């Protein structure tokens, strides 16, 4: 299946990007695609039929081809035993796409289609580059890393043989002033930014209003901006209203650079792209990893920032989660010097011009 947003006819062999399933795979791929296209390099995308990438990628003017493939993990022993039956047709479908476009290099950012696409690329003798966003690499990239020409990572320690390049972030976030400049002269309530992700995070929607009410009773002044996801908007508004806490509730924040610039502290999940943004912006955070993340990769991501002094880590499955959250926020909201130190530590972890760096590596490996 083909969803066309730019002509497939070109005088140059394209770069093929393999990415999909979640925004954590797709958005880094889009950033690198933008860097390649800015150099006049055509890009074509291989994704999975019916997944998120089929809607997002064409909006950026990139042609996407899709193959029928689904994930294996978490679907039981019968699914695992049936993997060859399901994966082999996907590999053959990917090979047909590769023969049609004859890409100069294939780049995997992970996701459903990346496995068949990467295997097909190597079977056809095409250069394969892997970029892993998380500290705990996904199964697809773990497999492909064994046969890839270059293995790139967003965090150190993902692979034994790796090149740590970081994760791409938007230019407007990376261009924000240093924390010391942003925080200088600020007064009034502490600005707390809560990020639940595009789908929202119910634990944050439930816990933050309760904890902030306790803190307000203790005369801790806070201005809250809470991004909750469209599906949980009414629920989140109700929780804050019931707690008697004023907050700006938003299902989606389109200008994340402005949001980070506004914030004194962030409470959020620990996806790789979000953490890259926190570092690029230079803002301290309280990280609550999603406990259902594959291989507990969000916790592994969070531990990297914690070790550098850029964040604090809380586990929502802890029986004393509310107590710990209240204690942590009470300390951070009343301690501007600690917030600044965390923000500066985050900024020191930032990698600059990541998309351009990856694009340069891709072009060096092109055939």
Curated annotation (Swiss-Prot):
Q: What pathway is it annotated to? A: Cell wall biogenesis; peptidoglycan biosynthesis
Asked if Cell wall biogenesis/degradation is a keyword of the record, the answer is yes
Q: Name the reaction it catalyses.
A: di-trans,octa-cis-undecaprenyl diphospho-N-acetyl-alpha-D-muramoyl-L-alanyl-D-glutamyl-meso-2,6-diaminopimeloyl-D-alanyl-D-alanine + UDP-N-acetyl-alpha-D-glucosamine = di-trans,octa-cis-undecaprenyl diphospho-[N-acetyl-alpha-D-glucosaminyl-(1->4)]-N-acetyl-alpha-D-muramoyl-L-alanyl-D-glutamyl-meso-2,6-diaminopimeloyl-D-alanyl-D-alanine + UDP + H(+)
What the entry lists under CDD domains is as follows:
GT28_MurG
GO cellular component entries: plasma membrane
How does the UniProt record describe the way this protein sits in the membrane? Peripheral membrane protein
Protein origin, superkingdom: Bacteria
Where does this protein hold UDP-N-acetyl-alpha-D-glucosamine? Answer: 22-24, 134, 170, 198, 253, 298
What family classification does the UniProt entry report for this protein? Belongs to the glycosyltransferase 28 family. MurG subfamily.
Q: What PANTHER family does this protein's entry cite?
A: GLYCOSYLTRANSFERASE, UDP-N-ACETYLGLUCOSAMINE--N-ACETYLMURAMYL-(PENTAPEPTIDE) PYROPHOSPHORYL-UNDECAPRENOL N-ACETYLGLUCOSAMINE TRANSFERASE 1
| Identification of the protein by name | UDP-N-acetylglucosamine--N-acetylmuramyl-(pentapeptide) pyrophosphoryl-undecaprenol N-acetylglucosamine transferase
The organism of origin for this protein: Xylella fastidiosa (strain 9a5c)
Gene symbol? murG
């Amino acid at each position: 299946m083909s969803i066309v947003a730019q002509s497939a006819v070109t005088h140059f062999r394209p770069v093929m990007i393999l990415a999909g399933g979640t925004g954590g795979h797709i958005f880094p791929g889009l950033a690198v695609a933008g860097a390649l296209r800015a150099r006049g390099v055509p890009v074509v995308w291989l994704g999975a039929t019916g997944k998120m990438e089929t809607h997002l990628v064409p909006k950026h003017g990139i042609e996407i081809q899709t193959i029928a493939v689904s994930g294996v993990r978490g679907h039981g022993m019968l699914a695992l035993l049936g993997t060859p039956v399901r994966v082999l047709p996907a590999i053959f479908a990917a090979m047909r796409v590769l023969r049609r476009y004859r890409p100069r290099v294939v780049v995997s950012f992970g996701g459903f289609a990346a496995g068949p696409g990467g295997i097909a690329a190597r079977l056809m003798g095409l250069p394969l580059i892997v970029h892993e966003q998380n500290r705990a690499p996904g199964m697809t990239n773990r497999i492909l890393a064994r046969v890839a020409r270059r293995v790139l990572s967003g965090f150190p320690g993902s692979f034994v043989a790796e090149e740590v390049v970081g994760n791409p972030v938007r230019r407007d976030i990376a261009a924000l002033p240093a924390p010391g400049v942003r925080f200088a002269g600020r007064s009034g309530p502490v600005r707390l930014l809560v990020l639940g992700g595009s789908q929202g995070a119910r634990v944050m929607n439930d816990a933050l209003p309760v904890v902030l009410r306790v803190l307000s009773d203790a005369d801790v002044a806070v201005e809250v901006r809470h991004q909750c996801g469209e599906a949980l908007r009414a629920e989140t508004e109700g929780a804050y209203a019931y707690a008697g806490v004023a907050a700006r509730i938003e299902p989606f924040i389109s200008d994340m650079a402005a949001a980070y610039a506004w914030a004194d502290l962030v409470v959020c999940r620990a996806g790789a792209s979000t953490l890259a943004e926190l570092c690029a912006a230079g803002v301290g955070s309280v990280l609550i990893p999603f406990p259902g993340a594959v291989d507990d990769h969000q916790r592994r991501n969070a531990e990297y920032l914690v070790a550098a002094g850029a964040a604090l880590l809380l586990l929502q499955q802890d029986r004393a989660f509310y107590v710990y959250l209240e204690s942590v926020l009470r300390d951070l909201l009343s301690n501007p010097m600690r917030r600044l130190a965390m923000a500066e530590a985050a900024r020191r972890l930032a990698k600059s011009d990541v998309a351009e760096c990856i694009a340069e590596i891709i072009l060096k490996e092109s055939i």
